[in-house]
């Protein structure tokens, strides 16, 4: 057994990272999605500014639950 060595086959295909091609329509959808996420984050910020104490209480665990 001491004379046998294991060799791993080289996988150059997996080592190369390819940049995905994004069509213009997908880019527009990504921008729309970003705008939706930004709007949601703005809404969360407003809730936290106006009622942060109650918001935090909603996440407090009681009795090990």
From Swiss-Prot:
Keywords: Coiled coil, Isopeptide bond, Ubl conjugation pathway. The gene is pup. Belongs to the prokaryotic ubiquitin-like protein family. Strongly interacts with the proteasome-associated ATPase ARC through a hydrophobic interface; the interacting region of Pup lies in its C-terminal half. There is one Pup binding site per ARC hexamer ring. Transmembrane segments: none annotated. Residues 26-49 form a coiled coil. Pathway: Protein degradation; proteasomal Pup-dependent pathway. Protein modifier that is covalently attached to lysine residues of substrate proteins, thereby targeting them for proteasomal degradation. The tagging system is termed pupylation. There is a cross-link at residue 65 (Isoglutamyl lysine isopeptide (Gln-Lys) (interchain with K-? in acceptor proteins)). This is Prokaryotic ubiquitin-like protein Pup.
């Amino acid at each position: 057994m001491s004379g046998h060595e294991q060799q791993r086959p080289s996988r150059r295909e997996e080592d190369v990272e390819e940049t995905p091609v994004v069509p213009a329509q997908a880019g527009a959808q990504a921008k729309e999605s970003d705008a939706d996420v930004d709007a949601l984050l703005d809404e969360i910020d407003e809730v936290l500014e106006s009622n942060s104490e109650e918001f935090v209480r909603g996440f407090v665990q009681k009795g090990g639950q």
